[in-house]
Swiss-Prot record:
Organism: Shigella flexneri
Keywords recorded for this protein, A-Z: Acetylation, Hydrolase
Name of the molecule in the record: Glutaminase 1
Highest classification ranks of the organism: Bacteria, Pseudomonadati, Pseudomonadota, Gammaproteobacteria, Enterobacterales
EC number: 3.5.1.2
Subunit structure: Homotetramer.
GO BP terms, alphabetized: glutamate biosynthetic process; glutamine catabolic process
């Protein structure tokens, strides 16, 4: 049994130590994100037996952004299976920025990872759907199943993103021209942008992590969301590419599968035990929450979790 007092103490200590840490800045290339109050901070744990521990602004709803890639990858694995995902999308880190087109050029237009923009747009196109609206509704539904029914599209975030996503449109056309997009290019880009524009809070983000930790069963709803056999593929991708250019550093220092988003959220999974999540808008140069990384790492260290430990 996990000690409830110890878990609450871990999140309290992480929040107290790092919630006012200086450094980083909000993502400024998306107008909505630039205007989120930079002093916000939160950290939460959701365990596989459904207990919740949190500190800070844990009810504040923020843009899911790139963490949505985890949900869409999960749905693609359910739809077409792990071999097809690896064949059509790839399963390797790029070693390049998350929105880079260089990796596409170096590999004949094929994306390498579903957790960077090119691979994520391709993954969105891989979802079984007859049209854009069905594709979008299926992706929104998997987000809600994994994290909570309150996850919903923000029209304000979506509008802010749709008017500035020229780079992603270019990526979509490159994928399409190389034969690695499985629906209309602008449909894929539009739905991808929408999936990044949903709002979530820190407890819901930790619930997403706990659902993965529990082998695909949401510990708050007790409903199976994913096949257990698909979860290890998601966690492997998170370990390799979840924090972009910081992924290797994260694996070395923290040793947990993780995923960040430029909305300031960050997620880590302790398989079989819990999800840990944090939120704070200021980002490092790779697009990861400065305080969020510190808070999640602190919780993991205090509790002694690292998948590489014997």
């Amino acid at each position: 049994m996990l000690d409830a007092n110890k878990l609450q103490q871990a999140v309290d200590q992480a929040y107290t130590q790092f919630h006012s840490l200086n450094g980083g800045q909000n993502a400024d290339y998306i107008p909505f994100l630039a205007n989120v109050p930079g002093q916000l901070a939160a950290v939460a744990i959701v365990t596989c037996d459904g207990n919740v521990y949190s500190a800070g602004d844990s009810d504040y709803r923020f843009a899911l952004e790139s963490i949505s890639k985890v949900c869409t990858l999960a749905l693609a694995l359910e739809d077409v299976g792990p071999q097809a995902v690896q064949d059509k999308i790839g399963a390797d880190p790029t070693g390049l920025p998350f929105n880079s087109v260089i990796a596409l050029e170096l590999h004949g237009g094929k994306p390498l990872s579903p957790l960077v923009n090119a691979g994520a747009i391709a993954t969105t196109s891989l979802i079984n759907a007859e049209n854009a609206e069905q594709r979008w509704q299926r992706i929104l539904h998997i987000q809600q199943q994994l994290a909570g029914e309150q996850v919903a599209l923000s029209d304000e975030v979506n509008q802010s993103e749709q008017t500035t996503n020229f780079h992603n449109r270019a990526i979509a056309w490159l994928l399409y021209s190389a034969g690695y997009l499985y629906c209309d290019a602008m449909e894929a880009c539009d739905v991808y942008t929408r999936q990044c524009s949903t709002l979530i809070n820190t407890v819901e983000l930790a619930t997403l992590g706990a659902t993965l930790a529990a082998g695909g069963v949401n510990p708050l709803t007790h409903k199976r969301v994913l096949q257990a056999d698909n979860v290890p593929y998601i966690l492997a991708e998170m370990m390799m590419e979840g924090l972009y250019g910081r992924s290797g550093d994260w694996a070395y220092r923290v040793g947990l599968p993780g995923k960040s988003g430029v909305g300031g959220g960050i997620l880590a999974v302790v398989p079989g035990v819990m999800g840990i999540a944090a939120f704070s808008p200021p980002l490092d140069e790779e697009g990861n929450s400065v305080r969020g990384q510190k808070m999640v790492a602190s919780v993991a260290k205090q509790l002694g979790y690292n998948v590489f430990k014997g």
